[in-house]
Design a protein with these regions (language model features):
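Structural motif
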Residues: 70-71, 84
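Hydrophobic beta-strand signal
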Residues: 73-74, 87
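Short, Lys/Arg- and Gly-enriched loop/turn segments at beta-strand edges
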Residues: 80-87, 96-98
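Amphipathic alpha-helical interface segments
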Residues: 114-143
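SH3/SH3-like beta-barrel fold
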Residues: 88, 109-112
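Short, positionally conserved secondary-structure boundary motifs
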Residues: 1-68, 95, 102-106, 129-130, ...
Length: 143
């Protein structure tokens, strides 16, 4: 009798990434121990040395698109396009998740929830530097 060929690849098409409960500043993402969960992403996303992590949303500043308890998948990045939704450090250690709007002389960290005020940061303000940590590529919500 003919044997069925094994068409399953030995290499998995997905990889596991950590979902962090928070993004404390000053610690390389690889060293953070506040891992709440694990998510799988397509292996092809990581081509070209791209790195990803997940983050649990705490709070409602990005409601209604993102809700408390949602998981966002982010691509690590140190820059972004204006309009990207990013996790950023403000003043070196406060991590926040906002829409980043780049203007000529300042950056606006825009919450999606109108109950919250946007944060405006002057590009020349050395006391409040904005550092991009990651750009949202996917939202995952448990029903």
């Amino acid at each position: 009798p003919k044997r069925a060929k094994n068409t399953m690849s030995t290499e998995s098409t997905s990889i596991r990434i950590p979902v962090l409960g928070s993004v404390p500043a000053g610690i390389p993402l690889e060293a953070i121990e506040d891992i709440e969960d694990w998510e799988e992403i397509p292996r092809e996303w990581t081509k070209g040395d791209k790195d990803y992590f997940g983050l649990k949303i705490h709070g409602d500043s990005m409601y209604p698109k993102y809700m408390d308890g949602d998981t966002i998948i982010l691509r690590k990045a140190d820059d972004c396009e204006s309009g990207d939704e990013c996790v950023v450090y403000v003043n070196g250690y406060d991590a926040t998740f906002k829409k980043v709007i780049k203007k000529m002389d300042h950056i606006i960290l825009q919450p999606l929830n109108s109950e919250y005020e946007p944060i405006m940061i002057d590009n020349n303000d050395e006391n409040n530097p904005v550092k991009i940590v990651g750009i949202v590529v996917e939202l995952r919500r448990k029903l």
